[in-house]
Amino acid sequence: HCISSAASDVYKRQHLADTNFFRSLKRKPVIINTSRGEVIETGALLEALDNKSISDAIIDVWEHEPEINLELLRKVIIGTPHIAGYSADGKANATRMSLDAICRFFRIERNYEIHAPVPNSPVIHAENYENALLQIYNPAEDSDRLKNQPELFETLRGAVSYTHLRAHET
């Protein structure tokens, strides 16, 4: 079982997953946070990991980042340096949103299109879907880098690369 956060900007988002939330869980899910760091209360998540009310946690966004909780980083199965927005799609969307806001502010007609670059098509040799996905991107590699050098959170965040794809290109 898995619970993944995808909090909207419309609703209350601070500490949606707090001590009461974790204590109310009937099963022991894996918790995944890729939305906003403040959605999950760090202390409550640590308590849930310690008392085994959840199976594990995967965290990409951290409460109080870039000052991340090192104890939590050590305890999660995968912890990455808020890399979700660093994909080509994420950068294209952020650029489009910025240009939209500038055009609205200056009352400029929006007559442009922004597209994410077309990704390379890697050749993947795998016996199953899991191995195929790990050839494209293995989050454990970024997790290991962050766990080994948490003080480089911002540097690692900007340095996420997909160079391993190039090894599989035709």
Predicted regions and their residues:
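Rossmann-like dinucleotide-binding domain for NAD(H)/NADP(H)
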Residues: K28-E169
